[in-house]
Design a protein with these regions (language model features):
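Secretory/endomembrane lumenal or extracellular ectodomains immediately following the signal peptide
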Residues: 3-81, 107
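Acidic/histidine-rich alpha-helical segments that form the ligand environment
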Residues: 131-171
């Protein structure tokens, strides 16, 4: 089963780590204790990702810094392409949590609902541009093929993205 169901959650009262309290407040509401109250995120996901990461405040903080990086407006990768890739990796790897979180993010960005709906069967959809299709193929190569990316696919990525954007997409 998933890791989050196998390691214990950290109740608010168990820690004085500022990052844990700040994230619990942000994600679940001021003063809510998701480990005790069984609270869900605003997107309806179980809160156990947050409550298990609270076992190590340093790991939680590192994860949060990644979110800040992704949302930095100075990123080279288009945020919609990044979200398509992350949602696709979630779907391909069978992670309902990752998939649902990134679908919610795409909705929040105002992405075309058809692109969101067709994500699971992107190969047969005409909703996507060439680069969007390449990004999802790249995500599948990373998630399903051990990172083996064909020269043809990489050429399409290079035709549309800078090296910096490809690095950010991969990260």
């Amino acid at each position: 089963g998933p890791l989050m169901a196998r390691v214990r959650s950290v109740a608010r009262a168990e820690t004085d780590a500022p990052i844990v309290h700040a994230m619990y407040d942000l994600i679940f509401g001021k003063g809510v204790d998701p480990a005790v109250d069984g609270a869900r995120t605003t997107t309806g996901s179980p809160g156990d990702w947050w409550t298990t990461h609270a076992l190590s405040p340093a790991v939680l903080e590192h994860s949060v810094q990644g979110f800040v990086l992704y949302r930095d407006p100075n990123r080279a990768i288009d945020p919609e392409l990044r979200e398509l890739a992350q949602a696709r990796v979630g779907w391909s790897s069978g992670s309902t949590f990752v998939y649902s979180q990134h679908v919610q993010s795409m909705r929040g960005m105002g992405m075309d609902p058809r692109k969101i709906a067709d994500l699971t069967a992107w190969h047969t959809s005409d909703a996507y541009t060439t680069i969007e299709r390449a990004v999802m193929a790249y995500a599948d190569a990373i998630a399903l093929d051990g990172g083996r990316v064909s020269d043809e696919l990489f050429t399409v990525l290079k035709d549309h993205l800078t090296d910096e954007a490809i690095l950010e997409l991969t990260y």
